[in-house]
Amino acid sequence: MKTDILIIGGGGAAARAAIECRDKNVIIAVKGLFGKSGCTVMAEGGYNAVFNPKDSFKKHFYDTVKGGGFINNPKLVEILVKNAPKELLNLERFGALFDRTEDGFIAQRPFGGQSFNRTCYCGDRTGHEIMRGLMEYISKFERIKILEEVMAIKLIVKDNRCYGAIFLDLKTGNIFPIFAKATILATGGAGQLYPITSNPIQKTGDGFAIAYNEGAELIDMEMVQFHPTGMVGTGILVTEAVRGEGGILYNKYKERFMVRYDKERMELSTRDVVARAIYKEIQEGRGVNGGVYLDVSHLPNEVIEKKLETMLKQFLRVGIDIRKEPMIVSPTAHHFMGGLKINERCETNIIGLFACGEVTGGVHGANRLGGNALADTQVFGAIAGKSAKEFVENHDFNNIDAEEDVAKILEEINSLKGDLNVYNLIEDLRKVMWDYVSIIRNEDGLKKALEKIDEIERNIDNVKVNGIIDLQNYFELKNMVVVAKLVTKSALYRKESRGAHYREDFPETKEEWRGNIIIKGKKMWFEKLDYSVFQNFLE
């Protein structure tokens, strides 16, 4: 199978990239079902964009880098804030509908860490509406083909040039290559590394791992965001829109505890601060049933029914009417700020390999602001598509083949004759990550985590594979181990606390650590960021 452009992923970034290169032959290869898997369709809160004349790009830029602990890539942040409004209007052109004010302007709500109400929304199902519009528009173009239920297990890279990827067909178990002149990774994050996550089952870090295995540079992998509010036990997201509309957090003593952690911003502090606050309340015995209360019962019923409709239905399914009683919430693994290192054209250090969305690092720094992720998918999805389209104008397949790569994979599969249950190993890995590499970290725990991850890795070859599901779990476990090591080693390397990365043995934020940890192969290094690079964009 050959194509001009191969897009791996099925969320908002992948869809927007496909639209941008719609006049080329495009294959969107999706691990799940297009539009029904991935994180975009599940995103509830909103899309940040500057529309109000009293707001500004500088304010959005500053909020983003301040929230990100001043280790964001300032060039990428500038691109994000300046292009977000245009891409939101493109979404409306594609068919998505955003809520409007009575005067006809795009409605905007407050979100955490922002100095202005700039989060555009469609009730509390914004991501679903965005995907609906993107899919509707994509359906008009015959040159965009969609291949569902296929998992990328290896990139085809020769002499640092990417020529596509090798896939596992999740319906048949077949292994097959797709050759492409340009490849775009839009595979999202790795929330499934943790037992409590807002992410869907597809998010096992595949893009991080298959790119790293071929020599891609990754950045900020220690920065994993835990959304402050997930449903207790399941981790299912309770959108930030709940707090944006006036939701109040309090503990079992009915104390509004955020006053102890951020007296000024309270419930609308940045996600890292709120998540640690909730975690601390629970750990110190002030929680309730493993969480804390989040209450909107003081809001008018019509506000809840219109602006928090999804949340109302979500909790009614478990017997809780949020119009009358509080929710119980706790932190849930949510977003990877780190990922593939890209430039302003969404190029990686591998020629012909582009990346966009959550699989990339640099945009959000040490902590992502709510509402910036959906904007990220559209802004950088468009850029990745444009860059890939320009690349294929001057590059061909170069008579490449993947017979040897496919043969090695088949040999690897045939050698799996052990007796260990692969899913049990996945569960073991998740427990290790939650216990030692989650909201609060320390050196002893991180070192213990590495030992346990190494032990799990040694056992991978001893698993039994009985059918396609086991085979999928096997490749996912391999990827998850790679990503777990990247996160843990980076967290051990950064001897400070910044954003989502909190070291209780190094609780202070240190100026000498204002910069980025980069990993390529067995090498890891630190690149300092001078504060002046941010000042240049704020003048």
Swiss-Prot record:
Q: Which UniProt keyword terms apply here?
A: FAD, Flavoprotein, Oxidoreductase
Report the Gene3D superfamilies cross-referenced here.
FAD/NAD(P)-binding domain, Fumarate reductase/succinate dehydrogenase flavoprotein-like, C-terminal domain, Succinate dehydrogenase/fumarate reductase flavoprotein, catalytic domain
Q: Can you name this protein?
A: Uncharacterized FAD-dependent oxidoreductase MJ0033
InterPro entries, A to Z: FAD-dep_OxRdtase_2_FAD-bd, FAD/NAD-bd_sf, Fum_R/Succ_DH_flav-like_C_sf, Fum_Rdtase/Succ_DH_flav-like_C, SdhA/FrdA/AprA, Succ_DH/fumarate_Rdtase_cat_sf
Active site positions: 227, 243
Which positions does UniProt annotate for FAD binding?
6-20
Family label:
Belongs to the FAD-dependent oxidoreductase 2 family. FRD/SDH subfamily.
